[in-house]
């Protein structure tokens, strides 16, 4: 069996060296964000409680 590095991609597909992140996106042209997203563990106590209450309320309505 051939090694995966020795195989060429099917015709019409670019080689791995030629592929960028995504077509039309450049690292220099990214728009700045107006807000910072929080990491999963950075949510506050009140936000967690409200989320739990909403989930309980939705479960009560569905079941």
Swiss-Prot record:
The induction field says:
Induced by salt in shoots.
Its Gene Ontology cellular component terms are: cytoplasm; plasma membrane
Alphabetically sorted, this entry's keywords are: Cell membrane, Cytoplasm, Membrane, Transmembrane, Transmembrane helix
- What are the TM regions of this chain, as residue ranges? 40-56
Q: Where is this region: Disordered?
A: 1-34
Q: In which tissues is it expressed?
A: Mostly expressed in roots, flowers and siliques and, to a lower extent, in stems and leaves.
Record membrane topology: Single-pass membrane protein
What is this protein for, i.e. what is its function? Involved in resistance to abiotic stress.
Q: Tell me what this protein is called.
A: Protein CYSTEINE-RICH TRANSMEMBRANE MODULE 12
Report the source organism.
Arabidopsis thaliana (Mouse-ear cress)
Lineage, opening ranks: Eukaryota, Viridiplantae, Streptophyta, Embryophyta, Tracheophyta
Instruction: Name the gene behind this protein.
Output: CYSTM12
């Amino acid at each position: 069996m051939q090694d995966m590095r020795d195989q060429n991609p099917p015709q019409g597909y670019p080689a791995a060296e030629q592929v960028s992140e995504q077509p039309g996106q450049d690292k220099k042209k990214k728009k700045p964000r107006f807000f910072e997203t929080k990491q999963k563990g950075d949510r506050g106590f009140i936000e967690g409680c409200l989320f739990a209450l909403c989930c309980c309320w939705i479960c009560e309505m569905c079941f």
